[in-house]
Amino acid sequence: MDLTNATIITAMVTPFQESGEIDFDKLPQLVDYLLANHTEGVILAGTTGESPTLTHEEELQLFQRIIELIDGRIPIICGVGTNDTRDSVAFVKELATIAGIDAVLAVVPYYNKPNQEGMYQHFKTIAEASELPIILYNVPGRTAACLEVETTLRLAQLEKIVAIKECAGLDAITELIERAPKDFLVYTGEDGLAFATKALGGQGVISVASHVFGSSMYEMYQALEQGNLPEAAKIQRQLLPKMNALFSVPSPAPVKAALNHLGIPVGNLRLPLVACTPEEEQRIIRTLEI
């Protein structure tokens, strides 16, 4: 399944039990809820899924369970990015043997701080080893390294690299939409830029807010596609403070609090992340108006 119909992709949270183990029993309700609210693809074991605290075996178990639950209805994208190229290569080769995975998400190497040629060679090596399509993930606020537009454009020439989740701002998004091959999909990874990215001709958004406001975001994109710019802009303006509230303390604490409040139990977080304080949670829920 390709990504051409996936405009709102949810970077899915990972439910945990009180003991800290993955709560696989909570996944069916979460998946059904996301599908009912217009999620058009899911990313597993990404930033929002708390990938740094998941073991390799846990990730594989999570992927298998979600594959069973989604059953081909929307694309499944699995996080494989590490700051070790050989490790990432081994992971993409392993995932190619699992039926039901549609693409992988590979983040810019973090902590090492490679230069642009190092980033290019990192992703090129992964692409040459992968049987699955690859989405690049540029998030300089977390990795301390930024994939520059020129490097992304070089990578976009490679067969297996099909898209980017771009979190380096609207200038980078705009230039990529203008200059990249037309079949290279540009997603924003920032909910606040969901409207602007789509309006500029991008594919859409890889979203945290879609856990809570997926239906409203879908309506916004429908309005854009129908040429109703004022209505789409109105929805984005109304959503923006709510989107910002979901990042008012380290994510995914706010969105997990929101889901729990909505009756979609996803539990707590794994250290070093911590849950919202009662005061933070009250403020967030009040802003979200849920």
UniProtKB/Swiss-Prot annotation:
PROSITE patterns named among the record's database cross-references: DHDPS_1 (PS00665), DHDPS_2 (PS00666)
InterPro entries named in the record: Aldolase_TIM, DapA, DapA-like, Schiff_base-form_aldolases_AS, Schiff_base-form_aldolases_CS
The enzyme's first-digit EC class, named in words, is lyase
CDD domains to which the protein is assigned, alphabetical: DHDPS
Q: What's a Pfam family in this record? A: DHDPS
Record-marked site positions (Part of a proton relay during catalysis): 47, 111
Q: Which residues does the annotation say bind pyruvate?
A: 48, 206
Compartments in which it is found = Cytoplasm
Q: What is its EC number?
A: 4.3.3.7
Pathway assigned to this chain's UniProt record: Amino-acid biosynthesis; L-lysine biosynthesis via DAP pathway; (S)-tetrahydrodipicolinate from L-aspartate: step 3/4
**Keywords of the record:** Amino-acid biosynthesis, Cytoplasm, Diaminopimelate biosynthesis, Lyase, Lysine biosynthesis, Schiff base
Residues at the catalytic site: 137, 165
Give the Gene3D superfamilies listed for this entry. Answer: Aldolase class I
Catalytic activity as recorded in UniProt: L-aspartate 4-semialdehyde + pyruvate = (2S,4S)-4-hydroxy-2,3,4,5-tetrahydrodipicolinate + H2O + H(+)
Give a GO biological-process term: diaminopimelate biosynthetic process
Which cellular components does GO assign to this protein? cytosol
Q: What SUPFAM superfamilies would the database entry show?
A: Aldolase
- Molecular function terms in GO for this entry? 4-hydroxy-tetrahydrodipicolinate synthase activity
> Is Lyase found in the keyword set?
yes
- Superkingdom classification of source: Bacteria
Q: Which family is it part of?
A: Belongs to the DapA family.
Q: How does it assemble?
A: Homotetramer; dimer of dimers.
Q: What is this protein for, i.e. what is its function?
A: Catalyzes the condensation of (S)-aspartate-beta-semialdehyde [(S)-ASA] and pyruvate to 4-hydroxy-tetrahydrodipicolinate (HTPA).
According to UniProt, the name of this protein is 4-hydroxy-tetrahydrodipicolinate synthase
Gene that encodes it? dapA
